[in-house]
Amino acid sequence: MALTLYNTLTRSEEAFTPIDPSNVRLYVCGPTVYDYAHVGNARTFSAFDLLARLLKHLYPRVTYARNITDVDDKIIDRSQRSGEPIDGVTARTTAQFHADMDALGLLRPDIEPRATTHIPQMIAMIGRLVEQGFAYAAEGHVLFHVPAMPDYGRLSRRSQDELIAGARVEVAPYKRSPADFVLWKPAKPGEPGWDSPWGTGRPGWHIECSAMTAAHLGAVFDIHGGGLDLIFPHHENEIAQSRCAHGTAVMANVWMHSGFLTIAGDKMSKSLGNFYTVRELLDEFPGEAIRLALLSAHYRQPLDFTKEKIAQAKQALDRWYGVLRGLEEVRAAEVPFDVLAALEDDLNTPLAISHLHELATAFHKADAAARPGLAGRLKAAAGLLGFLRQDPDAWFRGTPKGTDGLDEAAIEAAIQARKEARKAKDFAEADRIRAALLEQGIVLEDGPQGTSWKRA
C-alpha cells in the first residue's frame, strides 16, 4: 500500500509523491519559547513525530525541520514582566521544551533553526518582495500587500473581500489595504532590534518560517505541518511570502494540520482550571502513556483529553510491556502489514493501535512456541509508533518524577527480607512484607527465576 496523506490545500487525501525520493523534506512550526509547552502543543508535535518516524521507515533519508521562535511579542512581554533578560527566557524555555518532548519520547528534529539566527535571510526575502512589488515600506514598517497576490487565501478558502470585511474597524493608517500584514516592524525602546534598510526593527512572525524553510529545505519542499489554528493567518501568509519571493506555484506540496484538543469537553483554558502543561502531567504519568493517549484519536479529529485517558493508555502499555517481560527470546520481525497499512492511510493511529491490542491478545492465547514470534511482531509494530523502546523491567519499575515512591534499593532490600522469611518458613512475615509493599504501590510476582516487582 502507498502512503496517502490528507492535504489541507486540496481538501482531499492524496497519494504522497516526494519531490526527491532520496531526501523527503518535512517542516513543522515549532514552539514560541516563552512558557512551558502545554498538552495541545504536545498533540501537534506527537502527530508529526509519528509522521517523521513513518517517513524514515519508508524512505532512505528524511530531513525533518522544526523551528524555534525566539523573538516574539509574548517573549518580550514575559521578559518585561519577570525582569529576566530575553536571552534567559528563551534559553530556559527552550531547554524545558526539549526536556518535555524527550520525556514524551519524541524524536529530535534533524534541523532546529532559531529565528534569531536567520535575521539576514528574512531581511533579504523582505527586500525581494519589496523589489517585486509585493510589499512596501511605510512608517518604519514593511507590509505585504495582499491585493498584489490574486489567489491569496487558497489554503484557508477565504476571499480577499472576506478578509477586508473581517479586518479590524481601526486599520493602521499606513496600510494600503486592511488585509495587508507585517513583514518587518520598528523596535520600540528596550525591545530587541536589528539594523535593516527600513530602520532598526524585528521581523513579523510569518516571515520567520518562510525564510527558515527556504534556507534549509529549499523554495519548494514536500510537507508542511502544524496545528489547525495556524491555517490562517500564519500558514496562509507563509505561502504568500514564499511563493511571491521565489516565483513558485506552491511553497509545500502537502499541508497537514492536527485537530483541536479539549479537556473533558471544554476548551483548554487557565481560567477554567483545566490547563495542563506537559511538565505537570509528567509529574503524574509516564511520558510514553501521555503520548499514547495523544495518539489515541486520529490526528485530524478533535481529541477530548482527560487524565482517565492517560491512565487507560498506561494500562495498555502495561499489557504490551508485559508481553515482552520475562521472555528469554523476542524474535526480530518486520512491522506487520496491517499496522503499516493503517499508518500509511493518513496516519490512522486508532486502527494501528487496535492491531497492537490484537497482537497482545494473540500472544496470551498462544502456546510457548509461538510466543517469541508474536512478541517480536508486537515490538516491531509498537516500535514504528515509538513505543516499547525501553526495557520492560525499567517500565514497570518506573515512577513519575513528581510522585513519592520507594527507591529500588529499599524495594530490593524488602524482597530479600521476604525471601529470608520464606526460607525460615515464617510465612506470616513474608505475607506482611508483600502487603506492606503493595500498600506503597509495589506488586511482587513470584516466578521460576525468583521474585520480580512492578509499580501498580
From Swiss-Prot:
> GO molecular function of the protein, one example?
ATP binding
SUPFAM superfamilies recorded = Anticodon-binding domain of a subclass of class I aminoacyl-tRNA synthetases, Nucleotidylyl transferase
Name used for this protein in its record? Cysteine--tRNA ligase
Q: Which cofactor does it need?
A: Zn(2+)
Concerning NCBIfam families, the annotation shows:
cysS
State how the cofactor is bound: Binds 1 zinc ion per subunit.
GO cellular component terms listed in the entry, alphabetical order: cytosol
